[in-house]
Amino acid sequence: MGFYFMGPVDVPDYPPQRLVRIYVPNRAHASDRPLLILFDGQNVFDDAPSFAGGWRAHERVEKLAKKVSPPVVVGIDHGGGHRIEELSPFPMGRSHGRLDGFLDWIKRWLIPHMQHHFAVTHDPRKIVLGGSSMGGIAALYGLLSLPHVFGGCIAMSPSLWIARARIFQWAESRPAPEHARIYIDAGKREPPTMHTQADAMDKVLYRQGARNLHFFSDPTGTHSEAAWRKRLPRALRFQFGSAKKAAY
């Protein structure tokens, strides 16, 4: 139990090579372990590799272990200058929007690797994708486009505005997975559009059929690692504890 590091890992066609950071909780089950995959792995655990402080996800998981089924946590480092391109589902500016291929690598290589080497579950309902900002929209898109792979998402302060907010039209064109756990949040001290769009997306997904939704409006939340670190326990409780259905 503890930390493991893979890499540098080569994600084909997605330079540069990167670290994959893994934490196995002390209370992890011997088999069928839930899995939480987080984008921007530099920010997931300690402060050292992060530009603005880490989430210390390992500490959050351990503190909640008596209340939730503790997941194995995987942080995938972003590609530096390629980050926007690999996390965007749609073209924007000079970025071609290559998230689909990155998600395919997660589905075809990363998850099977975790299942084989870390006793991670084969039940998609126990596999959650998460992130913040660009990682937030990537996590939401990943769940909606691959509901047979992921059973939940954590989308903190998702950048829904990118590509002229195209994700709204995209989400309205398809059914949302009814039983998937969808956590979305935003802070009142972020740019107003961030909060308004996050709230609006929560309602869109309900209209499209999602029923395990949790939207949290953080009255003091800013667009920062510190705010996401503070909100992470709430997201973990929703994803890996007993979820309550949305009421509208």
Briefly describe each language-model feature range:
Residues M1-Y248:
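Non-catalytic cap/lid and distal C-terminal segments of serine-dependent acyl enzymes
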